[in-house]
Amino acid sequence: MQGFLRSLFFGVKKIPKRFAPLVEKGVLKEALQSNKDRYLLKEGFDIGKIERVKNKAFFISLAKNYPKDPLIKNLPPSFKTDALILCQIECSKKRPIAFFKAALLNADHAMIAYLAKEKNQIVAIPFKEPFKKPISLKHSQRSLLELPRHCVVKIDLKKREISEILGALEDPLIDENLSLSLFDRIKDFSKDCLDLAQYYAQLKASDFKDRINYSHIPFITIDPKDAKDFDDAIFYDKEKNTLFVAVADVSEFVPKHSSLDKEARIRGFSVYFPNSVYPMLPLSLSQGACSLKAFEKRLALVYEIPLDNLKNARLSQGVIEVRANCAYEEINHFLNTQQSSLGKDLQQSLLGFLEVALKLKKERLKKGFNFNSFENKLYLNEEGRIEKIETEKESGAHTLIEEAMLLANQSSARLLDGHFHNRGIYRTHKEPSLEQQKRLYDKLFDYEIVRPKNMGFFPFLEHALKISQEKSIEREVSRLIIKSQNLALYSPMQESHFGLGFASYTHFTSPIRRYSDLALHRLLKELLFHQAKGCSYLLEETPELCAELNALQKKAALIERDFIKRKFARLALEFLEKEFLGVVLEAKDWVVVGLKEFIGLKVLIKTNKVFKPLEKVRIKITHADLILGQVRGEITERIKEHVS
């Protein structure tokens, strides 16, 4: 059903028999038009799901993207989260409005809930909608009493019975499974999929013919220290001024339309938690046969990029043998001290390319923006509680890899531009609208950063970041700038990437963890190595595929965000009634305070007093909600000077 409804955004030649009543006499009749023998959703109509936040319902489109999720009006109260509905969208400056037209599918048969006692009865409270009426279960009260307090369960709504027990809400080790279940992420692979992965994992590089032997080139991978899936490797030949970028050739192990392919596409992306990963592909491939492990011959797609003439980049099917799997910290130590156990050829490659990468970055930032995201990395103990929080900062090693990957991705986009007339799988990023820009100007004004008259948006971003560095508030200003941006999206047509400053861009370098890259590999391989016979077929599915990927990208981000919010709420529970130094980040309906001691933990405070962003305050944590992942508190002291 969902696949058929998504296809209506792009046009279908024939309506399947089982869906004909919906179109001929049913709820879709007024929303569809016939255009050149194709049935297509009319302009202004949209199909999507419901996402509830507190007492409001928001519309999540199956295929379209809005700057903000539309607010649903006139929605009947009976509709559950994830029901599929037809809406008419009215765009406005602040937030689009979705007017409910009809229900297409209200068959949400399962729900995640937690057990609680209300009026001397144990009932199930919907996790995503804790404000709604509790659900009475068919189980006896005696049997429910045997379960842990606040037990988290999956409920079969038709039978009103528990179908799965996830565990006690108070147990931190439940958090991964809970976040995955809340957003319907499939955790396990089918037996067919695992068996097929195991079969392909046993194949050796020597089993594949007609590939260029690059095993003499000393490639290196550079990744986070806990990485196990190595997608990409680099080597810089200083004499030829040529960069080699090798990317795992995953498509050789994942046949199109196989169970492996279908299950990878359903997931779309690997989901990463601090201590684990839920991969897009089975471990025998993602951490085994496809991963570019040191001293193992591996299949790769290899770019040879002459840095004197980037347009002459050449893509080949090759066999490589990586010399070292290194962590960012290890490479940074070498770049700073010139001391390393790496071979001389690798040392020269890294030092030589660092010089080039810094120049490339400097040139790139004349048109693109350096989004300093200040990512917080959580370290968890064996009990699943936060042990340590580190802020990951930019480094020479990050610059090496980032610039190399950007070159490979741009080279791939050029192939799409030149051979498919700007069609394919692109990674795009729209410039913020005038309304979004104005909101950012207003927020930065509160931070005492004023936009000079007649200064354009892009120069102002650089100006704001420069002032923020002088004021030592770069983290806060970067956060505001990032929040003001549109999401980067996948598109079947070439559009520019505002953030990077590129006219054309795509994702090529992470096929182990992103289905977009795997699909792009198939398209480019068909073009370059298989007489382009299947290109038109692969191109035909890109509109629907890109829409799927955008939805799955959002889902993966929500899962990871939900997990982190709950971990911070657990941390706050350990410090109830304790006081901390913080800084005001926002001051609207709630005052939002970031804690200096626990970077990333935000405390919501309801107060009648007026506060300004960047005010230094002392707060007391009063409440932590594991359901909503919220921490609340009160301000106990106002400190006059700004945070340094």
From Swiss-Prot:
<comment type="similarity">
    <text>Belongs to the RNR ribonuclease family. RNase R subfamily.</text>
</comment>
<dbReference type="InterPro" id="IPR054561">
    <property type="entry name" value="RNR_OB1_N"/>
</dbReference>
<dbReference type="Pfam" id="PF00773">
    <property type="entry name" value="RNB"/>
</dbReference>
<keyword id="KW-0378">Hydrolase</keyword>
<comment type="function">
    <text>3'-5' exoribonuclease that releases 5'-nucleoside monophosphates and is involved in maturation of structured RNAs.</text>
</comment>
<protein>
    <recommendedName>
        <fullName>Ribonuclease R</fullName>
        <ecNumber>3.1.13.1</ecNumber>
    </recommendedName>
</protein>
<keyword id="KW-0694">RNA-binding</keyword>
<dbReference type="Pfam" id="PF24190">
    <property type="entry name" value="OB_RNR_2nd"/>
</dbReference>
<dbReference type="InterPro" id="IPR011805">
    <property type="entry name" value="RNase_R"/>
</dbReference>
<dbReference type="InterPro" id="IPR012340">
    <property type="entry name" value="NA-bd_OB-fold"/>
</dbReference>
<dbReference type="GO" id="GO:0005829">
    <property type="term" value="C:cytosol"/>
</dbReference>
<dbReference type="GO" id="GO:0008859">
    <property type="term" value="F:exoribonuclease II activity"/>
</dbReference>
<feature type="domain" description="RNB">
    <location>
        <begin position="211"/>
        <end position="529"/>
    </location>
</feature>
<keyword id="KW-0963">Cytoplasm</keyword>
<dbReference type="GO" id="GO:0003723">
    <property type="term" value="F:RNA binding"/>
</dbReference>
<keyword id="KW-0269">Exonuclease</keyword>
<dbReference type="GO" id="GO:0006402">
    <property type="term" value="P:mRNA catabolic process"/>
</dbReference>
<feature type="domain" description="S1 motif">
    <location>
        <begin position="573"/>
        <end position="644"/>
    </location>
</feature>
<dbReference type="InterPro" id="IPR050180">
    <property type="entry name" value="RNR_Ribonuclease"/>
</dbReference>
<keyword id="KW-0540">Nuclease</keyword>
<dbReference type="InterPro" id="IPR001900">
    <property type="entry name" value="RNase_II/R"/>
</dbReference>
<dbReference type="InterPro" id="IPR022966">
    <property type="entry name" value="RNase_II/R_CS"/>
</dbReference>
<dbReference type="Pfam" id="PF22896">
    <property type="entry name" value="OB_RNR_1st"/>
</dbReference>
